[in-house]
Amino acid sequence: DSERFYSEKIIYMPDTYQVNDPTIKIDSQKIKKENYGLPDNKFIFCSFNQNYKITPSIYNIWIKILKETKDSIIWILSENNKSRENLLEKLNLSQIDRDRLIFAEKLSHKDHLYRLKLADLFLDTFPCNAHTTASDALRSGVPVLTYKGKTFASRVATSLNYSFGLNALVAKDEKEYLDLAVAVSYTHLRAHETNS
């Protein structure tokens, strides 16, 4: 529908618009959550998007997710002190324990892909989706939860999920996004309890 807004000729590729390097390898050595300040017994939501993509609206949804999933934390890329302060202040105002938000420092791409394997579910941002960060998560074996917008920037993760056959993790709206996050967390934790 947005094609009329582009002066360039659009070339449609099968499955997804994004071309990725299939030769990138991820270290297969065992990784410990404690090395990254992560708890062993919690569901780990993550978002490694640049902080400007974390809008008040999407952060409010993440707060609701944390409230509905008591055995979870969220792991967010830390870009600067101001963004950390703002995210922590909102968490505090929402009466959620400080230890449920863990900041990740910037690492080399190779080391980042390695640590990403520790996350259980990547939470996408909206209206500007994850692009390379969503690809990185999927490449590391971490499913991405997104919801489909109307613009190119708000449909990137939808495109990537479709190419991976993860259509069930494309929500139609904010409520379904919240419900899916809670359901995935609950299902994962129940499976862990059963296998213990």
Where are these regions (language model features)?
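Short, conserved active-site loop motifs that form the nucleotide-linked donor/cofactor pocket
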Residues: 10, 100-101, 168
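Conserved catalytic-core segment of nucleotide-activated headgroup transferases in glycan assembly
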Residues: 16-104
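Conserved nucleotide-diphosphate donor binding/catalytic pocket of glycan-assembly enzymes
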Residues: 1-16
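Hydrophobic/aromatic ligand-binding patch that stacks against planar heteroaromatic rings
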Residues: 65, 136, 160
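Short, contiguous acidic/charged loop-to-helix segments that flank catalytic cores in large enzymes
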Residues: 49-54, 78-80, 125-128, 147-152, ...
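Single conserved hydrophobic/aromatic residue that forms the stacking wall/gate
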Residues: 188-196
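A donor-sugar binding/catalytic signature common to diverse glycosyltransferases
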Residues: 109-155
